[in-house]
Curated annotation (Swiss-Prot):
GO terms for biological process: translation. This is Large ribosomal subunit protein bL25. Pfam families: Ribosomal_L25p. Keywords: Ribonucleoprotein, Ribosomal protein, RNA-binding, rRNA-binding. Part of the 50S ribosomal subunit; part of the 5S rRNA/L5/L18/L25 subcomplex. Contacts the 5S rRNA. Binds to the 5S rRNA independently of L5 and L18. This is one of the proteins that binds to the 5S RNA in the ribosome where it forms part of the central protuberance. The keyword rRNA-binding applies. One of its GO terms (cellular component) is ribonucleoprotein complex. Disulfide bonds: none annotated. Belongs to the bacterial ribosomal protein bL25 family. The gene is rplY. HAMAP family: Ribosomal_bL25 (MF_01336). It comes from the Bacteria.
């Protein structure tokens, strides 16, 4: 399984997301249950490197480590920029083990 490292974030919204993107990062969210979600930030370069090396990346389960807590997730949705090769946002869905 692939491993991705992320950092939890406390500031959410348009302004905070724009600041992240200026730092070459992007916001993401882990849907844990119907009630709770975890907001995280990921590195644009790290994610693109993983994406380019693994063709089955979108179909397989991924280990996502956020602040030393391990989640097994699947990608639910990716939002990309219209003409740049940048990711704007990703939704992850936690897989129950």
């Amino acid at each position: 399984m692939l491993t991705i490292y992320g950092i939890s974030r406390t500031k959410c919204g348009k302004k905070a997301s724009r600041r992240l993107r200026l730092q070459n990062k992007f916001p993401a969210i882990i849907h844990v249950s119907l009630i709770s979600n975890i907001s995280i930030e990921l590195s644009q370069n790290d994610f693109i490197n993983i994406e380019m090396k693994n063709s089955d990346f979108y179909k397989s389960e991924v280990i996502l480590i956020v602040d030393k807590v391990k989640y097994i997730v699947k990608i639910q949705e990716i939002q990309r920029h219209a003409f740049k090769s940048k990711i704007l946002h990703i939704d992850f869905l936690k897989v129950s083990v």
